[in-house]
Amino acid sequence: MKLNERSVAHYALSDSPADHTGFLRTWGGAGTPPTPSGAGRKCWFVLKGNLLFSFESREGRAPLSLVVLEGCTVELAEAPVPEEFAFAIRFDAPGVRPHLLAADGPAAQEAWVKALSRASFGYMRLVVRELESQLREARHSLDLHRRSSWKAVSSRCKPQAPDRWSPGLENGHSLSRDCSPMGLVEEGGSRPAGRGLAEWELQGPASLLLGRGQSPVSPETSCFSTLHEWYGREIMELRRAWLQRAQENQPECKDQDRP
């Protein structure tokens, strides 16, 4: 693998957020030769994505080493020095030396092992696949829930047989039962046969209120007697208007009959 040293160094020192940072002791690896005492070298490590950088100190301006965390495993190991919480980065490729690192305590050791184990793109692909599987299952269960809810609502809203007192089609409006809290729903109908166009277009008190969005059907007026009285007013108005027009047309007819 070929990397541009300037680009890598710029990325290591950039303000991009790091996934994990801290001091670790290291034995071997590029740029970190073992110390004569064998206690390892304490360096500042920065993990960004799948790249692990090491610096001389926290304020270091040039990375000492770089480890690309692909095709490797992170596991606990024994440190050359007692009382060290060590772990190793081992690669699958032959001839590649493992990187032996050690933290100051068990909590730091566990945190580093988790962070390094989850840094590779291979782990990210596994996470994405698992999330996609969970998303498919969630969508499937949601679809089943919606279907069952729709079936339940449809079964509750099945049309019922009309009662004996149902007036049917009256005054161009039919009254049918529905699942609404009102108990009755008004549906517009066509013009009944036998009525004149002028008589049908005449707006009575009930139809005017209906045209304005005011309906006589309410929890207080849902009984048959109240509905009958309400629509009876419109019928009386239509009859009165029809008789008045008939009386007005009679003189004209008599004048036409004279020689």
From Swiss-Prot:
Keywords: Coiled coil, Cytoplasmic vesicle, Endosome, Golgi apparatus. InterPro entries: Boi1/Boi2-like (IPR045188), PH-like_dom_sf (IPR011993), PH_domain (IPR001849). This is Sesquipedalian-2. Residues 17-121 form the PH domain. Pfam families: PH. Forms homodimers and heterodimers with PHETA1. Interacts with OCRL and INPP5B. It is found in: Early endosome; Recycling endosome; Golgi apparatus, trans-Golgi network; Cytoplasmic vesicle, Clathrin-coated vesicle. The keyword Magnesium does not apply. Belongs to the sesquipedalian family. Plays a role in endocytic trafficking. Required for receptor recycling from endosomes, both to the trans-Golgi network and the plasma membrane. The gene is PHETA2. Residues 124-149 form a coiled coil. A motif (F&H) lies at residues 223-235. Was named after 'sesquipedalian', an unnecessarily long description of a simple thing. One of its GO terms (cellular component) is trans-Golgi network. One of its GO terms (biological process) is endosome organization. The keyword Coiled coil applies. The F&H motif, an approximately 12-13 amino-acid sequence centered around Phe and His residues, is essential for binding to OCRL and INPP5B. It comes from the Eukaryota.
